[in-house]
Amino acid sequence: MAAISTCQTVIPLPIPVFFNQQFPTLVDICARWQLVFDADAPFELRFESDTLTLHKRDEPKLDGIVVDFVTGAVAHRRKFGGGRGQSIAKAVGLKQGVTPKVVDGTAGLGRDAFVLASLGCTVIMVERHPVVAALLEDGLRRAYQDAEIGDWMRERMQLFHGSSLEALAKLEQEVDVVYLDPMYPHRDKSALVKKEMRVFQTLVGADLDADGLLAPAMALASKRVVVKRPDYAEDLAGVKPSMVIETKKNRFDVYVKSAMK
């Protein structure tokens, strides 16, 4: 398996999952992320066609959850998604001559981080849940090996497995922008959102500590903090942003500390 740019801080408690114990690759992945076999666990990890997938065992009709930076929706968005004219690009301050270094403090499946990296940003993805981090690492491994995007992916995207943004201070790296997208109850009933929200909410639970992310994010970012919210959500931690960029269903609350240069 190719080496992945991954940093780890706190050692999490072992997380129970179901997996094929006769498959050495799965055994290695689970050992690396301290995932322990449990015959009654609600989630199963599979490794098929060189890809790690997560399955909710009581909903077998659901497709597996996978991190894929090479094909599918994220690849289409990279090629046809509007480039630096996208709202997320404006929110983080991307402009001619400015490609900020970004920490995505709530990486999830890494889609927003990938958009920013594809536009030239260097992005460190922070993910605290070991199962999600394992999926991200597998997605990075395959992306790093891809002939089309592998070179710049290795340069621009890293994974940091830690329990909070405060741990990132130990990296001693200057960060221009911290990007946050805390899990929030979605009203969208599309199949994709329903599937992923069902899986994620069961797996990781709600971001009950989301309000506590703003202060360490502001301390870490030298230029700005960007918070992605559903259009109906309240301000994070009750703090009014410096400016708001609205999209059809979401908004980006921007907390400016200094000008982008």
From Swiss-Prot:
Record flagged with keyword Kinase: no
Disulfide bonds: none
Binding site for S-adenosyl-L-methionine: 111-112, 127-128, 163-164, 181
Keyword Phosphoprotein: no
Cleaved signal peptide residues: none
GO MF annotations in UniProt: rRNA (guanine-N2-)-methyltransferase activity
Pfam families: SAM_MT
Subcellular location: Cytoplasm
GO cellular component, one term: cytoplasm
Record keywords, A-Z: Cytoplasm, Methyltransferase, rRNA processing, S-adenosyl-L-methionine, Transferase
Transmembrane segments: none
Primary localization class, coarse: cytoplasm
E.C. no: 2.1.1.242
Superkingdom of origin organism: Bacteria
Catalytic activity: guanosine(1516) in 16S rRNA + S-adenosyl-L-methionine = N(2)-methylguanosine(1516) in 16S rRNA + S-adenosyl-L-homocysteine + H(+)
Functional summary from the UniProt entry: Specifically methylates the guanosine in position 1516 of 16S rRNA.
Similarity comment: family membership: Belongs to the methyltransferase superfamily. RsmJ family.
The protein's name in its UniProt record: Ribosomal RNA small subunit methyltransferase J
Species for this entry: Shewanella sp. (strain ANA-3)
Gene (name only): rsmJ
